[in-house]
Design a protein with these regions (language model features):
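Transmembrane-helix motifs of polytopic, lipid-linked glycan transferases
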Residues: 17-44, 84
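Specific aromatic-rich, kink-prone transmembrane helix
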Residues: 33-36, 77-95, 104-109, 126
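Membrane-lumen/periplasm interface segments of specific transmembrane helices
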Residues: 132, 151-199
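Short acidic/glycine- and proline-prone juxtamembrane loop motifs at membrane-interface regions
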Residues: 64-77
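Transmembrane-helix signature of polytopic, membrane-embedded enzymes
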Residues: 10-13, 34-61
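Perimembrane helix-loop-helix junctions
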Residues: 91-94, 122-161, 185
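Membrane-interface alpha helices of multi-pass inner-membrane proteins
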Residues: 101-117, 123, 128, 162
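Membrane-interface transmembrane helices that cradle and orient dolichyl/undecaprenyl
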Residues: 39-46, 85-102, 112, 134-140
Length: 199
């Protein structure tokens, strides 16, 4: 956004406003996926429309969610990833692990991998959720469940790696193998943080 804005505006304070647009769009996308997930979690046959919207409103109007959409940081990207993954899980509950839901889960996991590493708990939970729902909740023979697990799981892993692997490889090359950037983050904190906040 900032590079595009340089074509139309002078550098300065307006650049900060424009840089925030990415975060505004990420949080808007997160609210969109939470609204979609609420439709799956609270179907209209059992729940009123107010219940579905209350769930979405509680998530979308949390002060933290609103705050994340107003400043320049990747917290909002992690929020978008969490909402996408939640929607994939909710879609599984209604439709099983269709190809569409598997791809959606993979895209959500890739977005999560591109955000903060403290959001990686969603990746771990997605792995266990997928494995447990395939192995324990399907009614076919166990050998077919295992085959289904590896065939769909391989596609999920491949799509996730294609979408986010380039970033991790780039980081490993730039930061001497530190593909998550933890060592680099600690070095910057040591260099720039105030005395009492240094690691």
């Amino acid at each position: 956004f900032m590079r595009i804005s340089r074509l139309f505006a002078d550098p300065g304070y307006s650049m900060f406003k424009i840089a925030r647009m990415a975060d505004v769009l990420f949080v808007t996308g997160a609210v969109y996926f939470v609204v979609k997930a609420s439709g799956k979690l609270f179907p209209k046959e059992k729940y009123s429309r107010e219940v579905r919207w209350l769930f979405a409103a509680l998530a979308g109007f949390m002060p933290q969610a609103i705050f994340m959409g107003t400043y320049v940081n990747t917290d909002s990207l992690a929020l978008l990833a969490a909402a996408m993954i939640l929607y994939a899980w909710a879609s599984y509950l209604r439709e099983d692990w269709t190809w569409k839901n598997c791809i959606l889960l993979a895209v959500g996991m890739a977005v999560c991998a591109l955000s903060y590493y403290n959001a990686y708990g969603w990746l771990l939970c997605s792995f266990f959720f997928f494995c447990f729902t395939v192995l324990l909740c399907r009614e076919e023979a166990f050998s077919q469940r295992v085959r289904f697990l590896f065939s769909r799981g391989a596609v999920i892993a491949a799509v996730t790696l294609v979408l986010c692997g380039w970033w991790l490889i780039r980081n490993a090359g730039l930061y001497n193998g530190d593909f998550l950037g933890r060592k680099s983050c600690a070095e910057c904190a040591e260099k720039y943080a105030q005395k009492y906040y240094r690691p």
